[in-house]
Amino acid sequence: MRWFLETIKKKIKTGDKVRFVGGGALSPVTAGILADVLQIPVETVPEPQNVGAVGAALAVAVGLGRIADLKDVEALIKPNRVFMPNPDARAVHDKNYVAFTRLYSANKKLFHHLNQIH
């Protein structure tokens, strides 16, 4: 996740927080770890496992003119919790991140080979 976020930040302007959705967001432990790994606040929403259906319904509402603009949707979905990064966890996650990126680089050809096996 951190590598992906850092790559995105090089290409486009991003926000200063992440909204964590899906079934994994039901776990406060997972949300807290994500905040520590990314070192930015992580928001969760009520019933995060249903965001796909909620998003589809809101897109339909915009299409039908019940909601004026897609930009207005953000105000309708408010976070129910915000997980702040633990500064004390930063050193261990930074160390592990460096190790992960080195392991990936050293094994990139092997990963490619494994992905070609059917």
Feature map (PLM): residue ranges:
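Glycine/Thr-rich phosphate-binding loops that ligate phosphate moieties of nucleotide
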Residues: 1-118
